[in-house]
Every structure is written in C-alpha cells, then in structure tokens.
C-alpha cells in the first residue's frame, strides 16, 4: 500500500519537536507512535524500517526526535506527541505507543500515568523494542515499576543476548504484569539487535513482522 511522508513540528512547551508521519493512502483508523533510544534520532534505521512496514499495511505512523538522557523530559515530550495526535486532523480511532530502548521506557511511563478521566481507549497498546530493564551488569536494579501499572496490551521485542534485559528477568517481570503481554525473542541479538551471522535487514524483517502481526490481532479484535 502506498503512503505519503509528511514532515511536521509538534508543539512541546515553548519548543517544537521534529516529527515525520507516514500516512497511508486510505481512510485512517489506527496509528503508531515511535521514538528512539538514548542516542540517535527518529531516522534510526530500526524505526524507519518499522514505520515503512506498518504504513505499507495501512497503519499511520509518526516518528519523533527528542534528544537527551533525562527520562522525565523524554516522557513529557512523548505525552505532547500523544496529545497532538488526539486532536490532529488525522482523526485516528486509536494509537499504539512504541519506542526503542529509552524511547520504550518513556512510552511505558506515559501509558501507565494516563489519568482515569483520559481512559477513552485512544491508546490501544504498548510496543517495547529492546526495553532497557536494567543497566548492564546491574540486574539488581530493575526498571519494572511502570510495567506493573499498565493494563493495556504490551508487546516486548528483545534480543535473547540483550545486555540490558536479561531474558529470565524480563520473563519473571512479565508474569507479574496485570496487562496482557507477549514477548518475542530475537535469538542471539544484543541490545542493538545485532546478531552475528544475520544481516541487519533480516533481523528488521523479523521484528517488523512480529509487531505488525500483534497490532493486527488487537485491531481485528476491536472490530468484532
């Protein structure tokens, strides 16, 4: 399915966030918000590949840049993007919040802090690519508090050799979550999703396929 790229500026306090939308050439229903990790920007290959894949299957996709290591700042920026889409001209029925590494932490925090009065079903789920559950070699300090408060569906896509998300620890955290959840492991992938002996595009294809399938499952259920 063809789509159109639209560059825009999203209001964030007295600043503007750089963003790019991929808009499918069809009537819109659902969208996905994506942002990068502690480094990089919205043009990270992981994100551009995923956005193109989702848009080619009919899902509106917005990527945005918010640089910096201050997680509170990143969370506020993400919330501004979400609020922008709620009232935008695209008139989406719902969105999925997503991100890579630190970006997925910000998305998770936004979702778990949505006020009851805002629970209008606009946010349909959370996509965590390489969720940074802990610092390398600091498995005793888990970033799991927000995950336990989420009630909407969550998809984790992580590498089985991720130095910031030990496999058995994420599985234990997931078992305690109240939200419906799924974990897809990219075998032998590290935090950057690099796998020795596999091409980057091959890994991207696996990630993109899993995320699209999960989103389609939820949106198809909504139609019933």
From Swiss-Prot:
Pfam families: Abhydrolase_11 (PF20408). SUPFAM superfamilies: alpha/beta-Hydrolases. InterPro entries: AB_hydrolase_fold (IPR029058), KANL3/Tex30_Abhydrolase (IPR046879), NSL3/Tex30 (IPR026555). It comes from the Eukaryota. PANTHER family: TESTIS DEVELOPMENT PROTEIN PRTD (PTHR13136), TESTIS-EXPRESSED PROTEIN 30 (PTHR13136:SF11). This is Testis-expressed protein 30. It comes from Bos taurus (Bovine).
